[in-house]
């Protein structure tokens, strides 16, 4: 008896994790990627596995960010333009920025965060994934009283859901992170977290898929997904691939493919940036551990001998145009906390599109009206963090290995 065939559309962290766990369930899996494996939004993320960190819809942070939303030097920026779909999305997003919704989201994301940490540990140990994985946690460092207040709230919220987190004074942070300026007022430490090189992680997982007999095909642009009892995908080349099931793990590009199946996923592309710095041969990045800069939401992550500055959230459409001012803001933000970070050589400047939902939760499950087409998208800034648990959940949904849990039901596309 032949194995069931599953097509996974998208070769980022979500797609390869879905393929990996499907391959563990005796499935013939093929990953179809439009570009190269791991070269989309996964490539340039901050590399922080921030399990349990509160989602986008934190009311206090959102209210603060929306006051300067048209200022291109702030963490959240909306490019002025006529875009009815974005306006509708923002309306729904603001309606979800309540304490009640935040608590509901954490009730879903908390268990997923604990599960994904276990899966990461298993992957690193059992598959010997070489991705500069460091289970050293990360810091939130703040220079203002408002920032430290936000950090204390993050700690309280994460502790309430079983994650190890502690509030730190400025002096305590300075003792642990000696490269920071001495005007840091306080912050937090989240030990139930880790860091890695996200691109290497994706490439390594894709290699394990191939070792298990799966295929990864690059340069394969999927233009249409056909549903029904015998699903299939059509490529830009005119080719047609049939399968027993299809998984859409196409990030910010999921909207169009799902729409043709009658499903309107309210996903907006949130552009993020990174700038990688190297500090000369034999030198190490000027940080002992990863940290997020509380007032600017910029992550500073030591990664494979370099320092990655990553962050910002920009709504400017489905494009990869980079704005120099956004890149410059990354360095300017880091210098507020680290001082002069030169002499450093810029080795990479990048932007990518994160798929953002208005309620702050990913979209995982069967598309409405379909029995064999599944979505795995909408992770915003948590794609790397939730990659393994998403892959495991999707594999169970596709194969029917276990009944859907409460968390999976909350992520279903039908909620929209």
Predicted ranges, named:
Residues 2-12:
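Beta1/beta-strand and adjacent pyrophosphate-binding region of the FAD-binding site
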Residues 4, 167, 361-416:
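C-terminal lid/capping helical subdomain adjacent to the catalytic/cofactor pocket in oxidative enzymes
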Residues 24-43:
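Glycine-rich FAD pyrophosphate-binding loop
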Residues 46, 193, 297, 315-318, ...:
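Glycine-rich phosphate/pyrophosphate-binding beta-alpha loops
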Residues 46-168:
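Dinucleotide-binding Rossmann-like beta1-alpha1 core, especially the glycine-rich loop
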Residues 47-49, 53, 57-96, 222-231, ...:
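Active-site substrate-recognition segment that forms the wall
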Residues 104-117, 140-150, 175-176, 188-207, ...:
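Short beta-strand to alpha-helix junction loop
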Residues 149-161, 180-237, 241-244:
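Helical element adjacent to the flavin cofactor pocket in flavoenzyme catalytic cores
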């Amino acid at each position: 008896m032949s194995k069931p065939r599953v097509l996974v559309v998208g070769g980022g962290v979500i797609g390869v994790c879905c393929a990996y766990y499907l391959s563990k369930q005796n499935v013939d899996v093929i990953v179809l990627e439009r570009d190269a494996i791991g070269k989309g939004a996964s490539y340039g993320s901050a590399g922080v596995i921030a399990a349990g960190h509160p989602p986008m819809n934190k009311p206090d942070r959102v209210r603060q960010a929306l006051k300067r939303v048209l200022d291109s030097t702030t963490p959240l920026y909306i490019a002025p333009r006529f875009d009815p779909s974005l306006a509708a999305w923002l309306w729904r997003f603001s309606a979800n920025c309540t304490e009640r919704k935040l608590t509901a989201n954490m009730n879903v994301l908390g268990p997923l965060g604990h599960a994904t940490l276990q899966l990461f540990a298993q992957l690193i140990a059992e598959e010997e994934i070489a991705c500069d994985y460091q289970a050293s946690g990360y810091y939130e460092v703040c220079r203002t009283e408002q920032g430290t207040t936000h950090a204390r709230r993050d700690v309280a919220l994460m502790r309430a859901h079983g994650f190890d987190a502690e509030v730190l004074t400025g002096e305590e942070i300075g003792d642990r992170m000696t490269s920071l300026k001495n005007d840091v007022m306080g912050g937090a430490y989240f030990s139930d977290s880790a860091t890695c090189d996200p691109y290497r992680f994706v490439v390594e997982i894709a290699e394990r898929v191939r070792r298990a007999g799966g295929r990864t095909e690059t340069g394969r642009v999927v233009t249409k997904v056909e549903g029904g009892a015998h699903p299939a995908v059509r490529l830009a080349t005119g080719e047609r691939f049939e399968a027993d099931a299809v998984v859409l793990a196409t990030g910010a590009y999921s909207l169009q493919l799902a729409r043709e199946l009658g499903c309107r996923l309210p996903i907006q592309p949130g552009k993020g940036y990174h700038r990688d710095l190297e500090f000369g041969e034999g030198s190490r990045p000027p940080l002992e551990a990863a940290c997020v800069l509380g007032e600017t939401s910029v992550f500073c992550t030591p990664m494979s001998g370099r320092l990655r500055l990553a962050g910002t959230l920009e709504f400017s459409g489905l494009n990869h145009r980079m704005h120099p001012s956004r890149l410059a803001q990354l360095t300017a933000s880091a210098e507020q906390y680290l001082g002069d970070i030169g002499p450093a050589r810029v080795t990479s400047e990048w932007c990518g599109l994160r798929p953002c939902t208005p309620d702050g939760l990913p979209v995982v499950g069967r598309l409405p009206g379909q029995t064999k087409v599944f979505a795995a998208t909408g992770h915003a800034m948590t794609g790397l963090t939730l990659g393994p648990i998403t892959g495991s959940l999707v594999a169970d949904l596709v194969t029917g290995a276990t009944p859907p849990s409460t968390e999976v039901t909350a992520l279903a596309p039908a909620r929209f």
